[in-house]
């Protein structure tokens, strides 16, 4: 028998540097220095994208970042975050503190592998967790009233069960990510011919009334294009990765540009009216200057404070291929001020007015696209094929358009959150909204008003006060959502279950 020899590698060799010089990433949690918040300090070897990874971890834990200082110039990375839990208190739970330390340390050790994978794929897509039971489908296009309903109806016609879906609309553009399975076998859809059929069907729906003068709708397979219809098996996600992908999709359809000025249909006109109404109340101000001495561009952002604000800003800069060297954030609970010292990934500052204008518009869009102004409807139902199609069709037929959707399946239940507005662009009369709960009994329906209060750090889902008198607005059409859903009782009543 021939002997086979190979070199021996000590398994501790990879950790030799850490044993000599200490761990490459140190995380400190300080609960003593400041009375009303916890200080999280991160010291690490500097790697491109590490700041985003740390912010993603804090974001996924629903922590509120009230102040932050970042410095990563040279070979070392130093971050300080002042954070509170979702209730506005200091972090006292030892398991939460240990999870932060472990998650950031693990993220740092895996950073080199992730960056190598991204380099090999030549892609900035977030690394998503594997969901072996679902097929991910991504869609982008020109938004119009009723499009969400048409998309969900198409899934029902294609015998696809929607297990999870998230959709944003902004400036008459739409981005949607859906995780589906075959409604008969409950397995991922991996047949190329069937995926092609799904692509063709959904492409037809999305492009049905798209203005030919608009370039905001693109259709193509994932391996060929960066936007349009994208399909792939086994793509799941954590919360912030899903949101980062939605940011990327909205950026790909240029939602930072104004909608087409001369819409050829009433549906596009209503989107334009919504956009104009939003622009009148815009509170985000972005400016860019240059630091000639150090070769930085200085980006300042003033806006209303809310949760995930820092994440939205940083992931947009990273996806636009800018490197953040220094940064500072502070907030007073109502307003937030952010400052970033950046260069392009090739080492240059923002020298042209055109590039500065594009960064300004993209950051404004990234901050504003998450803020939905409308009425939020929360429903919990027994999951079945066609449920989302039925719900969104009822809303569409009665003059409500969905501007954002979050759908999740937990066991046999489907948890649905729809942000809706009047199709004509007017505010929905809150008197009818307040009467919905009484009319819907025993069916449970949560109604939250997003018009009167922005999503601040004090409340992730702001609601209208029950004692507050809603501002009266002239309405061309008055209706009752309770009556609408009651008319569909034969089909829907057996599927709704209480959320509590």
Curated annotation (Swiss-Prot):
Gene3D superfamilies in alphabetical order: 3.30.70.260
Biased composition regions of type Polar residues, renumbered to the chain: 462-474
Region (Disordered): 450-478
Domain ACT, residue spans: 39-121, 136-213, 298-373, 376-459
Keyword Repeat assigned: yes
Protein keywords: Repeat
Keyword Transcription: no
Pfam families: ACR10_N, ACT, ACT_6
PANTHER family, A to Z: ACT DOMAIN-CONTAINING PROTEIN ACR2, ACT DOMAIN-CONTAINING PROTEIN ACR4-RELATED
Role summary: May bind amino acids.
Designated name of the protein: ACT domain-containing protein ACR2
């Amino acid at each position: 028998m021939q002997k086979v020899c190979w070199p021996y590698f000590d398994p501790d060799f990879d950790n030799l540097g850490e044993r000599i010089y200490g761990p490459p990433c140190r995380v400190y949690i300080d609960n003593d220095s400041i009375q009303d918040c916890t200080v999280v300090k991160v010291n690490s070897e500097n790697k491109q994208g590490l700041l985003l990874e740390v912010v993603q971890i804090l974001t996924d834990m629903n922590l509120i970042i009230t102040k932050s200082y970042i410095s990563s110039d040279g070979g070392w990375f130093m971050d300080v975050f002042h954070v509170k839990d979702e209730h506005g208190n200091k972090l006292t739970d030892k398991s939460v503190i240990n999870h932060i330390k472990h998650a950031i340390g693990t993220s740092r050790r895996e950073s080199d592998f992730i960056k190598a994978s991204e380099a090999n794929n030549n892609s900035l897509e977030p690394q998503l967790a594997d969901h072996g039971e679902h097929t991910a489908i991504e869609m982008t296009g020109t938004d119009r009233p009723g499009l969400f309903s048409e998309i969900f109806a198409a899934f029902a016609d294609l015998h696809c069960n929607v297990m999870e879906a998230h959709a944003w609309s902004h400036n008459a553009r739409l981005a949607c990510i859906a995780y589906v399975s075959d409604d008969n076998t409950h397995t991922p859809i991996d047949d190329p011919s069937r995926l092609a059929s799904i692509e063709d069907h959904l492409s037809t729906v999305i492009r049905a009334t798209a203005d030919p003068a608009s370039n905001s709708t693109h259709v193509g397979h994932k391996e060929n294009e960066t936007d349009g219809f994208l399909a792939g098996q086994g793509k799941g996600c954590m919360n912030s990765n899903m949101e980062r992908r939605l940011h990327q999709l909205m950026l790909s359809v240029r939602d930072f540009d104004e909608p087409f000025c001369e819409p050829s249909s009433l549906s596009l006109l209503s989107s334009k009216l919504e956009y104009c109404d939003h622009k009148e109340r815009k509170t985000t101000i972005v400016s860019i200057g240059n630091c000639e001495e150090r070769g930085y561009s200085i980006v300042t952002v003033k806006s209303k404070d809310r949760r995930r604000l820092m994440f939205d800003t940083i992931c947009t800069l990273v996806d636009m291929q800018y490197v953040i060297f220094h940064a500072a954030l502070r907030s007073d609970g109502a307003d937030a001020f952010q400052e970033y010292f950046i260069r392009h990934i090739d080492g240059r500052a923002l020298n042209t007015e055109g590039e500065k204008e594009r960064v300004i518009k993209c950051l404004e869009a990234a901050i504003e696209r998450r803020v939905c102004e409308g009425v939020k409807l929360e429903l919990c139902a027994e999951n079945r094929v066609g449920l989302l199609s039925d719900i969104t069709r009822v809303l569409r037929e009665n003059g409500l358009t969905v501007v954002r959707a979050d759908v999740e399946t937990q066991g046999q239940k489907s948890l649905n959150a729809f942000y809706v507005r009047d199709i004509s662009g007017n505010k929905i009369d809150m008197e009818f909204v307040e009467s919905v709960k009484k009319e819907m009994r025993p069916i449970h329906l949560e109604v939250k008003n997003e018009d009167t209060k922005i999503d601040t750090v004090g409340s992730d889902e702001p609601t209208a006060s029950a004692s507050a008198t809603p501002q009266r607005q002239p309405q061309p059409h008055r209706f009752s959502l309770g009556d609408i859903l009651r008319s569909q009782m034969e089909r829907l009543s057996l599927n709704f279950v209480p959320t509590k």
